[in-house]
Amino acid sequence: MKINSVKIKMLMLERDLNIGELAKLMKSSRQWVGAILDRGHATLNMVNKIAKALEVEPKEIIKLED
């Protein structure tokens, strides 16, 4: 599913988190989280982990596909 990488990065900035810190909250690797943000795609499971780590609803970080 498509994710809004810009929104995620803005949320990270607001929370003073870098990719490594976000990855730690998600119990994932920094490289994997970085790759997800670069690609702009993630599985539903990863979207849920990102949302939980950023304390937002998953719908706030996904892009609706056309």
Regions found by a protein language model. Name each.
Residues 19, 30, 44-47:
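Helix-turn-helix DNA-binding elements, focusing on the entry/boundary residues of the two helices
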Residues 39-52:
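Short, basic-rich loop-to-helix N-cap that marks the start of a DNA-contacting helix
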Residues 12, 36-38, 65:
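DNA major-groove recognition helix of helix-turn-helix
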Residues 1-18, 25:
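A short, Lys/Arg-rich alpha-helix, primarily the initiator
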Residues 55-66:
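Short C-terminal boundary/hinge segments that cap the last helix of small helical domains
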